[in-house]
């Protein structure tokens, strides 16, 4: 069924197809149809960050930036749903076209630029949703906020989403907001994380609950840089790391149509690079902080490979675009079939 739907959707421009798919998934969720039409994955509960997940396969941020289809995605069988990236104020993102399919490589290039309707709108959608599972909210900074003032934007979003999120992801790794990735390193990273950790403890007291903080990092780092990031995350008291965002590299797609477009590359070509980051993080963290693996999962076995590399959970986005809900079931089954330690 999804194969036919994809053939029709892929005749449209990528962004039109994305918006239409979001509308359809959202409508199906409101009507309660998605769970009926889609075969559900096997139960595979797991506890991570003190949260109970129905299964370890989640929706990565970016597909539902404004929380428009939370119930719809949950009904497809995802073990958790992450929405955003959301910024304090609404912003249009980068000029179109800004989203490109590379079907020969099962890949996508995007330079969306955190287009979203703002944190207040997102929270309206969260409050309207019936979903009671694990909901992550991914936060970022506005395009016109100087990098030196980025912490202000993250704190605004943290304050607003805190009471509505199961966990909060701090996105410092999108390649489409100038200067953002510089926040992953050195004093910039430590100052940001320390500010977030301090405010989180205050919010925990006010709300009577401690909401986990996850940091999403890029795949375009050396082993040494990754090790330094891991050390800073532990020192600052973060609860998880998401590895990884899209890559600026173009290995394997250089000669394909749209392969030279600016933006972040996701899908199959980022699998090896992303999984390597997971392995490095796992060695550095030594089990002291869970890893949520994202990047390049287009087959169920890729999800199992991420878990074997040291991840506790996985997320999919580009693979879902190409494979549909079947990939969720396939990934859950592959993880369930792994030998127990």
From Swiss-Prot:
GO molecular function: dihydroorotate dehydrogenase (quinone) activity
Co-factor remark: Binds 1 FMN per subunit.
EC number, UniProt record: 1.3.5.2
PROSITE patterns: DHODEHASE_1
Cofactor(s) essential for the protein: FMN
Alphabetized SUPFAM superfamilies for the sequence: FMN-linked oxidoreductases
Reaction(s) catalysed (UniProt annotation): (S)-dihydroorotate + a quinone = orotate + a quinol
A Gene Ontology BP annotation from the UniProt entry: 'de novo' pyrimidine nucleobase biosynthetic process
Keywords, in A-Z order: Cell membrane, Flavoprotein, FMN, Membrane, Oxidoreductase, Pyrimidine biosynthesis
Catalytic residue list: 174
Protein family membership: Belongs to the dihydroorotate dehydrogenase family. Type 2 subfamily.
Role: Catalyzes the conversion of dihydroorotate to orotate with quinone as electron acceptor.
HAMAP family with a match to the protein in the record: DHO_dh_type2
Name this protein carries in UniProt: Dihydroorotate dehydrogenase (quinone)
Source species of the chain: Pseudomonas putida (strain W619)
């Amino acid at each position: 069924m999804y194969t036919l739907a994809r053939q029709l959707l892929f005749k449209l421009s990528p962004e039109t197809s994305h918006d239409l798919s979001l509308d359809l998934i959202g409508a199906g969720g409101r009507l309660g149809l998605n769970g009926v039409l889609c075969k559900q994955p096997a139960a595979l509960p797991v506890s991570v960050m003190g949260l109970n997940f129905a299964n370890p396969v989640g929706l990565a941020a970016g597909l539902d930036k404004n929380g428009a289809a939370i119930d719809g995605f949950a009904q497809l069988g995802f073990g958790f749903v992450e929405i955003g990236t959301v910024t304090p104020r609404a912003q249009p993102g980068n000029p179109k076209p800004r989203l490109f399919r590379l079907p020969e490589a099962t890949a996508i290039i995007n330079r969306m630029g955190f287009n979203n309707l703002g944190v207040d709108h997102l929270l309206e959608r969260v409050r309207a949703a019936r979903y009671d599972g694990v909901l992550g909210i991914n936060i970022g900074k506005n395009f016109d906020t100087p990098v030196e003032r980025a912490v202000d934007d993250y704190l605004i979003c943290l304050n607003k989403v805190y009471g509505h999120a199961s966990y909060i992801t701090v996105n410092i790794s999108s390649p489409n907001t100038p200067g953002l990735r510089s926040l992953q390193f050195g004093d910039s990273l430590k100052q940001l994380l320390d500010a977030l950790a301090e405010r989180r403890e205050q919010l925990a007291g006010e709300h009577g609950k401690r909401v986990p903080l996850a940091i999403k990092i890029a795949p375009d780092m050396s082993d040494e840089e990754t090790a330094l990031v891991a050390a800073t995350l532990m020192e600052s008291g973060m609860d998880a790391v998401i590895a990884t965002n899209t890559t600026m590299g173009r290995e394997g797609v250089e000669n394909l149509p749209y392969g030279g477009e600016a933006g972040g590359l996701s899908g199959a070509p980022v699998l090896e690079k992303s999984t390597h980051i997971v392995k490095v993080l796992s060695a550095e963290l030594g089990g002291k902080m869970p890893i949520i693996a994202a990047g390049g999962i287009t087959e169920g076995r890729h999800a199992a490979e991420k878990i074997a590399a040291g991840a506790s959970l996985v997320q999919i986005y580009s693979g879902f675009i190409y494979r549909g809900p079947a990939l969720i079931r396939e990934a859950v089954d592959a993880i369930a079939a792994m030998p127990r330690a």
